[in-house]
């Protein structure tokens, strides 16, 4: 008995960035076409204008807008050539409208999951939407108190799947020691365990946790957080096998070996990084074109590519759609395992 293909909403992101381009490229891929019923959330004029601009420039195939199912947002926005690669408050406002519409329709049951193309946070702010990013909007609209950013990538070399959750997300580095409380780390671990068990089907997960300081504090000589509370919290955490706190610089050696298929390194089922760049530098070094942002703690599946709007190359036809493709495929895969 075949499993019905899931229904996904795919937002255009900021229309002045590469979002519309990578949407057209991803939807031209037969693997993407066959994995789910995909509806693009946005303005059809944006897709049509992007298609006209790129059809003679793009080395990769583009899906024709006429054949793409659309949920029209009717924002009144018109994509003009002068806006592409620049963006403004108007493009920020419509990208917010696309996301809000996708979430509302998903909560109403029209879709089972959402895949979001990139937005520009500073243009949201110009438009009056003071959110750190799309993740926080999703959480607020779905009334999700605890949520997290997990980055998932499957190696094309070995087939090993890397999973990295961030304990803190879009905050300045100087605020991390204050924001990173025992309660925050415990909540992140709970989110990670829940996702590994219920989303990925791993009943008894092993989780590696990075220290905050160089050498995981060196017994309090290079920082106090590990000695004062982090080590004890991890030792007494009862819902998974925990490795850590591990030195943040060497924790990523085994995942790198597993990614490249080198030897048989001891790898965890997932890795907890304590701040944004601690987790995303290794993820992007290993899997920039393949990593997917999976939001944990929501009542629906949400994925996105792990890159931004790339205004510097928008409108040139050279943007790669691989990360968006992987985001669509992962959402479809997870919904196939856990249909709702």
From Swiss-Prot:
It comes from the Bacteria. One of its GO terms (cellular component) is cytoplasm. Pfam families: PdxA. Keywords: Cytoplasm, Metal-binding, NAD, NADP, Oxidoreductase, Pyridoxine biosynthesis. Its cofactor is a divalent metal cation. Pathway: Cofactor biosynthesis; pyridoxine 5'-phosphate biosynthesis; pyridoxine 5'-phosphate from D-erythrose 4-phosphate: step 4/5. Its main location: cytoplasm. It is found in: Cytoplasm. Binds 1 divalent metal cation per subunit. It catalyses: 4-(phosphooxy)-L-threonine + NAD(+) = 3-amino-2-oxopropyl phosphate + CO2 + NADH. One of its GO terms (biological process) is pyridoxine biosynthetic process. InterPro entries: PdxA, PdxA_fam. It is an enzyme of class 1 (oxidoreductase). Substrate binds at residues 135, 284, 293, 302. Homodimer. Catalyzes the NAD(P)-dependent oxidation of 4-(phosphooxy)-L-threonine (HTP) into 2-amino-3-oxo-4-(phosphooxy)butyric acid which spontaneously decarboxylates to form 3-amino-2-oxopropyl phosphate (AHAP). The active site is located at the dimer interface. This is 4-hydroxythreonine-4-phosphate dehydrogenase. It comes from Synechococcus sp. (strain JA-2-3B'a(2-13)) (Cyanobacteria bacterium Yellowstone B-Prime). The lineage of its organism: Bacteria, Bacillati, Cyanobacteriota, Cyanophyceae, Synechococcales.
